[in-house]
Amino acid sequence: MLYWLAEYLQEYMRGFAVFQYLTVRAILSVLTALGISLLLGPWVIRRLTEMRIGQAVRSDGPQTHLSKSGTPTMGGALILSAMFISTLLWSDFGNRYVWVVLIVTAIFGAVGWVDDYRKVAKRDPKGLPARWKYFWQSIAGFGAAVFLFCTAQAPAETQLFIPFFKNVALNMGLFYIIFTYFVIVGTSNAVNLTDGLDGLAIMPSVMVAGALALIAYLAGHSQFAQYLHIAYIPGAGELAVFCCALVGAGLGFLWFNTYPAQVFMGDVGALALGAALGLVAVIVRHEFVLFIMGGIFVLETVSVILQVASFKLTGRRIFRMAPIHHHFELKGWPEPRVIVRFWIITLVLVLIGLATLKFR
């Protein structure tokens, strides 16, 4: 919105030309989303408390979590609101990537909202039935995959690139659609599984989004892409504005979500953020790098899969409790220690992911 307005006004005042720079708009996107989150956060928490939208805590989980019962949840709506407002203010409306990411993020957020609402307002512990949850996730995931496949303007947009290797790209054909679907839906649910401790999911999401913002900027710039031997995706740079909005909104939310949390993001936030990260990684052709940078999300998901498989096959559990962050809690680690150590691991993995841009 402001991008187009500035484009019009620069004919009369040359100073508005500064808003044509992607880096300027990305920085403003961070600050705008951060400001919105910090300003609206207290009001959102107060409203959720008044509406009795409180988190229900499992009785079979760590006993230290019982004190969290009743903490306002569905705070992910605050993150999404700040993200969307900031993105719409500073991005180029004519960019197809911006719209597909916004729409998919909104759909996954809506699925999470319904799931949270049924759990909290309707007192239904199961929330939205799993079949319906995955049905709507699949609709959005496949829809995005088909759209990107059909609108691809260059072979690189549907090729699979292998990190650490120069000029290694695999033509996927129609398999691109299936692959994209699994990246989007898989990342969405992986972030959701990670969201079990105060600030545990949001900070890694912020770190990964920040890295993806840089990658999107480089992938959308022909000279940088050529120099780094990464896929050049025309228009992908505009996703840096979206990713920066996620960073700002996430940091603002963390202000209230840090231990001890005043609000939880709920499925409305976790599912949406995961889908957004997965889709951006697909567009900029860095799915494997996302797998590296989001290693904590992968670890949490694998721990659940192994736990379920082991119990069904042998009747024994590998971990004291899954996802794995609960395992460490039951071993005696204080919650803040688990959180910060997982953050540190994510920071290291993000740096490794960014290193793949140069080490080829």
Swiss-Prot record:
Organism whose genome encodes this protein: Cellvibrio japonicus (strain Ueda107)
Listed InterPro entries: Glycosyl_transferase_4 (IPR000715), PNAcMuramoyl-5peptid_Trfase (IPR003524), PNAcMuramoyl-5peptid_Trfase_CS (IPR018480)
The protein's Enzyme Commission number: 2.7.8.13
Cellular location(s): Cell inner membrane
Pathway(s) the chain acts in: Cell wall biogenesis; peptidoglycan biosynthesis
Function comment: Catalyzes the initial step of the lipid cycle reactions in the biosynthesis of the cell wall peptidoglycan: transfers peptidoglycan precursor phospho-MurNAc-pentapeptide from UDP-MurNAc-pentapeptide onto the lipid carrier undecaprenyl phosphate, yielding undecaprenyl-pyrophosphoryl-MurNAc-pentapeptide, known as lipid I.
Keyword Metal-binding: yes
One example GO MF annotation: phospho-N-acetylmuramoyl-pentapeptide-transferase activity
Transmembrane segments: 25-45, 74-94, 97-117, 134-154, 168-188, 199-219, 236-256, 263-283, 288-308, 339-359
Coiled coil: none
Protein name according to UniProt: Phospho-N-acetylmuramoyl-pentapeptide-transferase
Catalytic activity: UDP-N-acetyl-alpha-D-muramoyl-L-alanyl-gamma-D-glutamyl-meso-2,6-diaminopimeloyl-D-alanyl-D-alanine + di-trans,octa-cis-undecaprenyl phosphate = di-trans,octa-cis-undecaprenyl diphospho-N-acetyl-alpha-D-muramoyl-L-alanyl-D-glutamyl-meso-2,6-diaminopimeloyl-D-alanyl-D-alanine + UMP
Cofactors demanded by this protein: Mg(2+)
Family indicated by similarity: Belongs to the glycosyltransferase 4 family. MraY subfamily.
Pfam family, one: MraY_sig1
The organism's place on the tree of life at top rank: Bacteria
Main location as per UniProt: membrane
Keywords: Cell cycle, Cell division, Cell inner membrane, Cell membrane, Cell shape, Cell wall biogenesis/degradation, Magnesium, Membrane, Metal-binding, Peptidoglycan synthesis, Transferase, Transmembrane, Transmembrane helix
